[in-house]
Amino acid sequence: PGSVCAAFLKNNTEADGIITTKPALVRKARELSMYTVLRYFLLDSMAYENILSQQHSVHPDFIEVLPGAMPKVIHRLCTEIKVPVIAGGLITDKESVMGALTAGATAVSSTNHKVWNL
């Protein structure tokens, strides 16, 4: 199913890439020369370790970590992986944006319109 979805997006939309939690979908999208963001929900240490191990086999263009309002964890992750990190989730104000960026995130993502206008 993931390969069908990626092919559909590539062939029938103007999408340049995908954001997904599924490593197999990242692999397929990369085969189709699409940009890829592999999203992780950092709930515990096991989720953190999954990022470290999967980055080498999946090769996403970016890794997005949620929640993004964890500068200490983002800093640690950015020193341990070579993939650019996007901080997302719970990014609600300038302080959380600056905290993530200062910690080493390449970018932040947010649905909060106030953050878009900073």
Residue ranges and their predicted role:
Residues 19, 37-38, 64, 108-110:
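Conserved beta-strand positions in the central sheet of alpha/beta enzyme cores
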Residues 1, 19-23, 41-44, 67-69, ...:
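Glycine-rich beta-to-alpha transition loops that act as phosphate-gripper elements at the mouths
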Residues 67-70, 89-118:
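Glycine-rich phosphate-binding active-site loops on the catalytic face of alpha/beta enzymes
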Residues 22, 63, 100:
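Conserved, mostly hydrophobic/aromatic
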Residues 51, 61-86, 90-91:
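Catalytic-face loop-and-helix region of soluble metabolic enzyme cores
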Residues 1-15, 23-32, 44-54, 71-73:
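N-terminal active-site wall of soluble small-molecule enzyme domains
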Residues 14, 32-41, 78-88:
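Short beta-strand/loop segments at the ligand-binding rim of alpha/beta enzyme cores
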